[in-house]
Amino acid sequence: MLLFINRFAKTIILLFGMLVFLVLLGLGGAALYFKDNAAKLYIDTRKSIDSSFDSSQAFIDTYNGSSSKFSVESINKQIEEVKKKVEESTKKLEEYEKQINQAKGLNGYLVSPEKLKELQEAKKSLQATKSQIEKYANTLKTANNGKTGQNGTSSSTIPITKISGSTISVSTRDTNGKTNSALKDIQEFSTQANDIIKQYKEIKNKIPTEKQFNEYYTIGAITLVSVSGGVLAVLIVSTVMTFLGSKKLGLRTFSRLTSTDQIADHVNDILDRYPELEDAVLEELDQ
């Protein structure tokens, strides 16, 4: 009974191991087969983030390199463009994260926990950036709505001479000679805007480039296929060789190559365990 249980347990473990490596081999094969789709999704996400960064950088560069007068409406319009890009980037990151979560069995072997953590941090940074941009837009909108010119109409033109580093150089009065109350509300804009750029740079540095992604993905998939396929092949070959090279006598299985020696050893073990049986056998042989 114990012999049967032992043999049954070994068979179950062998079959389970083969099934596990077969699944891993299938996942690796699927990863290679859908490589182009995975790369396209990643590239789209990366391009969206890069586009958002470029839009934000251009927005700041426009102010830094200009000595013209900008209207609140113009600023709001550009902020809305940047906000739109951030929302697109956030959506792309969420789609990428969703794809990973839907295929944990595959990507769990191809994407390290550190990279998944960086993806979460990148998404949080984008969400924080979006909140900041909305705050800036609301501040400017409130300032603009509260400003009236000499003729009682809204005056939205703000003489900004330069934004550089964390400083905004501005005129303290509008073209009509009245103090522009909106200036106070946007004095911190340069520092905040540069914070946005800094956040984007951190995001860009955390996310692998297109070339790096293809290298990581391909190496991970090939490694998964090679290791799982190799182990599975060894298990199958060893099982077949064991089956072809063995024969069963009673409840015991012996190797065809060394069956005589194995049977002799087995008989000796029985005789050593039961001395009276050995005496009976010897008496029978002497007759």
UniProtKB/Swiss-Prot annotation:
Domain of life the protein comes from: Bacteria
Principal subcellular localisation of the protein: membrane
Membrane topology recorded in Swiss-Prot or TrEMBL: Multi-pass membrane protein
InterPro entries, A to Z: MG279/MG280 (IPR030940)
Cell compartments where the protein resides: Cell membrane
One GO cellular component term: plasma membrane
Keyword annotations from UniProtKB, A to Z: Cell membrane, Membrane, Transmembrane, Transmembrane helix
Ranges that cross the membrane: 12-32, 217-237
Name the record gives this protein: Uncharacterized protein MG280 homolog
Organism: Mycoplasma pneumoniae (strain ATCC 29342 / M129 / Subtype 1)
